Regions:
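Conserved beta-strand-loop-alpha-helix hinge in the C-terminal portion
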Residues: 164-192
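ABC family nucleotide-binding domain
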Residues: 1-153, 157-160
């Protein structure tokens, strides 16, 4: 979907100017997605679920499996590689989803309420894992959440109300606790 106004620039590309085929290619090559409901394929084990996006890139089966196993190890699931989604807990399924998003080495990861279906302990484990990995791999994570505690871990927070940007805050959790966070309230004219 194209924006009604303004522009979207990711990695120097004006996304709003791309046609449908170019958008598909851009998403496949540069974007990873983490979903609230995991979106794992029930008939595939963890390795197959993680390897799936690599098949769309034309990567051979053995190479896909090897890479998928590397990312499952990265998220701490080396013992669950042959497990089907219904044999894993919610936290384990979400880690498979994270591995699937990361396996394509995206520049940007979009996470839609990635911990919405998890208990508080697993939420913190998953959040720390995502934060660690994206920092180590120099990736951008864009996370949608209604949980202010989760949002406080972000380096930059954009508050949206009724489809308009109403505030922008910078500084991660450490800056918030130390009182060094920068806050900007947006008025009607700035948010257009």
């Amino acid at each position: 979907e194209h924006p009604s106004k303004g522009e979207i620039v990711i990695a120097g590309k004006h996304i709003e100017k791309l046609n449908e085929k170019q958008l598909v290619t851009f998403r496949r090559e540069r974007v990873g997605f983490i979903f609230q409901s995991y979106n794992l394929i029930a008939t595939m084990d963890a390795v197959e679920n993680v390897a799936l996006p690599l098949s769309f890139r034309g990567m051979g089966k053995a190479r896909r499996a090897k890479r998928a196993k590397e990312y499952l190890k990265l998220v701490g699931l080396e013992r669950f590689m042959t497990h089907m989604p219904n044999q894993m807990s919610g936290g384990q399924q979400q880690r498979v989803g994270i591995a699937r998003a990361l396996v394509v080495n995206p520049q940007i990861i979009f996470a839609d309420e990635p911990t919405g279906n998890l208990d508080s302990k697993t939420t913190m484990e998953v959040l720390r894992l995502m934060q660690k990995i994206v920092r180590e791999q120099n990736q951008t994570l864009v996370m949608v959440t209604h949980d202010n505690n989760l949002a406080s871990y972000a380096d930059r927070r954009i508050r949206i109300m009724d489809g308009r940007i109403v505030g922008i805050e910078t500084g991660g959790r450490e800056a918030l606790y130390e009182g060094n966070a920068e806050k900007k309230e947006c008025n009607e004219n700035e948010s257009k």
